[in-house]
Amino acid sequence: MSALETQALGMIPMVIEQSGRGERSYDIYSRLLKERVIFLVGEVNDQTANLVVAQLLFLESENPDKDISFYINSPGGSVTAGMAIYDTMQFIKPDVSTLCCGFAASMGAFLLAAGAKGKRYSLPNSKIMIHQVLGGARGQATDIEIHARDILRTKDQMNRILAERTGQPIEKVKADTERDYFMTADEAKDYGIVDQVIAKRP
């Protein structure tokens, strides 16, 4: 999350730490990054994806054996940006534990399901929504046809991954993602997007 985006969320609290060498202040997100916590808040786009990918790679370099916590409150966004995050989550050595706090829709829900099996969580009043890939091509008919073929290929790719991550049959995933498919936290658990609904830390 960039400084400009965090400013848009309102006043960002600062945390002051004292040590033998004096005081140091962090914005709250940087302090939580030290605890291996990453946030995806708002739309998935190239900028947010680059920041999340950079944080994942940094935390892997700090300790490749310790889990990373990825908190998601996102309506979704760009497929290509989201796939950059997804591929990095699978690429790095540490397990990435995902947690939905609020809303995970579209690419947000896809990334929620992308967490390490057994380590995907949702808070009890969160909502999750899956649907098919969106696209908007303009221009010459031939160009639109090329884009349509690519969107259909991407749709099949994402359905296949979601079926694999959730354990649902591919035909069910295809049918459910034809339109917006909303779920409560418990329904998302039954679907296989998350492994556990938690109200308090264990």
Swiss-Prot record:
Domain of life of the source: Bacteria
Molecular-function annotations in GO: ATP-dependent peptidase activity; ATPase binding; serine-type endopeptidase activity
Localisation per UniProt entry: Cytoplasm
Keywords: Cytoplasm, Hydrolase, Protease, Serine protease
E.C. no: 3.4.21.92
Active-site residues, as the UniProt record annotates them: S106 (nucleophile), H131
GO terms under biological process: protein quality control for misfolded or incompletely synthesized proteins
CC annotations in GO: cytoplasm; endopeptidase Clp complex
Pfam families hit by this protein: CLP_protease (PF00574)
Reaction it catalyzes: Hydrolysis of proteins to small peptides in the presence of ATP and magnesium. alpha-casein is the usual test substrate. In the absence of ATP, only oligopeptides shorter than five residues are hydrolyzed (such as succinyl-Leu-Tyr-|-NHMec, and Leu-Tyr-Leu-|-Tyr-Trp, in which cleavage of the -Tyr-|-Leu- and -Tyr-|-Trp bonds also occurs)
CDD domains hit by this protein: S14_ClpP_2 (cd07017)
NCBIfam families membership: clpP, PRK00277.1, PRK12553.1
HAMAP family: ClpP
Subunit structure: Fourteen ClpP subunits assemble into 2 heptameric rings which stack back to back to give a disk-like structure with a central cavity, resembling the structure of eukaryotic proteasomes.
Function: Cleaves peptides in various proteins in a process that requires ATP hydrolysis. Has a chymotrypsin-like activity. Plays a major role in the degradation of misfolded proteins.
Family in the record: Belongs to the peptidase S14 family.
UniProt name for this protein: ATP-dependent Clp protease proteolytic subunit
Species name: Acidovorax ebreus (strain TPSY)
